[in-house]
A protein has these predicted regions:
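Conserved P-loop NTPase catalytic core
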Residues: 1-21, 67-71
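Short alpha-helical segments and helix-capping/turn motifs at coil-helix boundaries
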Residues: 10-22, 96-97, 135-139, 170
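Long, hydrophobic alpha-helical segments
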Residues: 192-201
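Conserved C-terminal RecA-like helicase domain
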Residues: 20-132
Length: 201
């Protein structure tokens, strides 16, 4: 769906902007979590879709950097304008320098299944600096992701009042104030309301 495409673009942009703020870029690691379905089979479908979409984005950025087109600017313009504050945009303008950093992110990005049938995908990305995890139940067990910039979270437990699970999910959010302006959570109104309720307890 377009919402997931938008979230992937946000992750690439946010990672590039974070890189632009750091002197030692080789030490920067960022994470994205996709939590949309419980069924393991659907995780593989999402994995393949995200992998293909990232390859499409790579081609657009390469063409834009070489001057063959402005496809990447068109593709990311709306995401950049909607996701970041004026202060962020002032310090990290959407220009060729940022586009090059986005290309660097894509060159060092990895996707992994985080479930009981991960097929070795987690081992394959352990040396990647920018990691996207796709899963369900294993992501509910209190894992904290450092520099979690983008969360795509559309699955909610069918049973009401699952307080322990919901609070464990909240532990994903290893957020820090020093990059809070780059963080986005993509979710449904129902889930947002539930977490707001938990936060007020």
């Amino acid at each position: 769906p377009e919402s997931l495409q938008f979230a992937v673009r946000h992750f690439i942009l946010a990672s590039a902007i974070l890189l632009s703020k750091q002197k030692n870029q080789s030490r920067i690691h960022t994470h994205m979590v996709i939590h949309a379905f419980r069924e393991v089979e659907k995780h593989s479908i999402i994995y393949n879709w995200v992998a293909n979409y990232i390859e499409t984005i790579k081609g657009s950025i390469e063409d834009s950097l070489s001057g063959e087109s402005n496809d990447a600017f068109v593709l990311f313009f709306d995401t950049y304008n909607k996701c970041f504050t004026d202060d962020v945009k002032q310090n990290s303008p959407f220009d060729k320098h940022l586009l090059q950093l986005m290309s660097d992110v894509l060159d060092n990005i990895g996707i992994a299944l985080h479930n009981g049938k991960d097929q070795g995908t987690r081992d394959s990305i352990k040396f990647k600096s920018h990691q996207i995890y796709i899963g369900a139940q294993l992501l509910e067990r209190g894992i904290t992701f450092d520099r979690l910039l983008t969360t795509y979270f559309t699955r909610w437990p069918r049973s009401d009042g699952n307080m322990d699970t919901n609070l464990q999910r909240a532990r994903w959010f290893g957020y820090r104030l020093k990059y809070a302006e780059l963080i986005k959570l993509f979710t449904t109104e129902t889930i947002a309301d539930e977490f707001s309720f938990l936060a007020e307890m």
